[in-house]
């Protein structure tokens, strides 16, 4: 797998546009992965700050937010007990990405909408999140 090599070459490119976004995104993923690996709880305030930064930067630069930022943003807000904001994040994300399975799963977990559950089971039964949450 040459993914780390590709990532390293990308960061070495001095002409990389918006590299700060990519750097912060990978820094965030690394933080989440390492805390999960050692069983340590994450710092939810830090998570919210980083996701807020990535959300705003994405919106400003591309006028659009990537689905993964909605997903991670939702998780960060939930971890920080910002329930109203997390609900808004999922709704906004689903408007932009109505076919996003992770967003649909989180929406189902919040609402227990049976039609959404049926859709997930029928059309995405083998998706890891559908399996993990035993929908």
Model-found features: residue ranges?
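Amphipathic alpha-helical repeat scaffolds of TPR domains
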Residues: 1, 8, 12-45, 49-53, ...
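Terminal, low-structured helical/coil segments at or just beyond the last alpha-helical repeat
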Residues: 64, 93, 106-135
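Short helix-adjacent coil turns
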Residues: 1-2, 81, 112-115
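Surface-exposed, polar/charged faces of alpha-helical domains
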Residues: 81-84, 88, 95, 99-103
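Alpha-solenoid helical repeat scaffolds
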Residues: 8, 52-55, 91, 118
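Conserved structural position within tetratricopeptide repeats
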Residues: 12, 56, 91-95, 122-125
């Amino acid at each position: 797998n040459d993914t780390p090599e590709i990532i390293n070459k990308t960061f070495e490119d001095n002409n990389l546009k918006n590299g700060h976004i990519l750097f912060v995104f990978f820094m965030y993923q690394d933080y989440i992965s390492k805390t999960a690996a050692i069983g340590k709880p994450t710092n939810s305030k830090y998570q919210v700050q980083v996701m807020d930064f990535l959300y705003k930067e994405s919106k400003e630069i591309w006028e659009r937010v990537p689905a993964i930022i909605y997903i991670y943003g939702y998780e960060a807000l939930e971890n920080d007990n910002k329930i109203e904001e997390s609900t808004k994040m999922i709704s906004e994300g689903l408007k932009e990405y109505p076919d996003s399975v992770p967003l649909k799963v989180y929406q189902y977990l919040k609402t227990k909408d049976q039609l959404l559950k049926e859709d997930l089971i029928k059309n995405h039964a083998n998706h890891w999140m559908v399996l993990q949450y035993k929908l």
